[in-house]
């Protein structure tokens, strides 16, 4: 629940938020054409959006298990008023699933991405720390330096009874810029948590949680941080009423 019901978003769980789209579905298959993610134009450049972001997903389901396979692709060019006009390609492929074993359940997931930041991936800023750098860069010749990365997560839970559920999880995210020197050393973040959902009444529950997160930055990109490998420990709880 930390970080606004973070759910390991940006730390093993790939997430891009909600954007305008046109979606088609048949059975367990979904195909979507989505508004691309870019930053604003400025005095030196404009973005030439040629095609929409394209995403596809297929969901497999059984009585006690599920499996989701997904992928996405985004492409645009940067038109500099002076100099080159580089193309930016970003994509992701991933797999996630889960299974119930009586009162226990386990969820696993993983993904690999190129230029995830340009794609619009959510960057985790736990405790106000700076998200790891998962975006491309432009060099002095106005060429694109790509960024590649991956993430994974695992969650294990136990439904003790109708009132109590115990859950623990761990997530990891890594990204590396394709440049020489310290800036290409790669950055990572991992998080582990343990919580308990307590059902007080129908629609009313409380979730106490403890957790730990650790960041590892390439030193040259640590803007506003006191150290290259900060970490945080947190403890708290939330309550929620569903009407």
Predicted regions span which residues?
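Outer-membrane beta-barrel "beta-signal"
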Residues: 198-200, 204, 229-243
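Outer membrane beta-barrel
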Residues: 1-40, 48-55, 59-63, 98-102, ...
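C-terminal closing repeat unit and adjoining cap/tail of repeat-based domains
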Residues: 192-211, 215-217
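Residues that define the transmembrane beta-barrel architecture of outer-membrane proteins
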Residues: 16-20, 25-27, 48-54, 87-93, ...
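Residues on the lipid-exposed face of transmembrane beta-strands in outer-membrane beta-barrel proteins
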Residues: 22-26, 56-60, 95-99, 108, ...
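Transmembrane beta-strand segments that form the barrel wall of outer-membrane beta-barrel proteins
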Residues: 7-9, 29-37, 67-75, 165-175, ...
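Detector for outer-membrane/organellar transmembrane beta-barrel domains
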Residues: 61-190
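C-terminal/domain-terminus segments
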Residues: 38-51, 55-57, 170-195, 218, ...
């Amino acid at each position: 629940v930390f970080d606004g019901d973070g759910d390991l978003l940006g730390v093993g769980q790939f997430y891009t938020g909600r954007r305008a789209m046109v979606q088609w579905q048949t059975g367990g298959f979904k195909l979507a054409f989505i508004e691309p993610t870019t930053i604003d134009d400025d005095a030196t450049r404009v973005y030439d959006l040629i095609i929409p972001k394209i995403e596809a997903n297929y969901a497999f389901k059984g009585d006690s298990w599920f499996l989701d396979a997904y992928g996405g692709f985004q492409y645009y060019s940067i038109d500099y008023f002076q100099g080159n006009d580089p193309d930016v390609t970003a994509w992701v492929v991933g797999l996630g699933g889960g299974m119930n074993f009586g009162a226990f359940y386990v969820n696993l997931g993983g993904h690999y991405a190129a230029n995830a930041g340009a794609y619009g991936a959510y960057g985790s800023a736990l405790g106000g720390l700076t998200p790891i750098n998962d975006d491309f860069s432009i060099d002095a010749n106005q060429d694109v330096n790509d960024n590649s990365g991956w993430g994974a997560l695992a969650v294990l839970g136990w439904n003790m009874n109708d009132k109590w559920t115990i859950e623990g999880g761990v997530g990891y995210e890594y990204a590396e810029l394709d440049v020489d020197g310290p800036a290409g050393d790669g950055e990572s973040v991992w998080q582990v948590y343990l919580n308990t959902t307590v059902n007080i009444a129908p629609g009313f529950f409380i979730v106490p949680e403890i957790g730990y997160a650790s960041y590892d930055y390439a030193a040259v990109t640590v803007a506003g941080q006191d150290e290259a490998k900060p970490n945080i420990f947190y403890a708290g709880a939330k309550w929620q009423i569903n009407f």
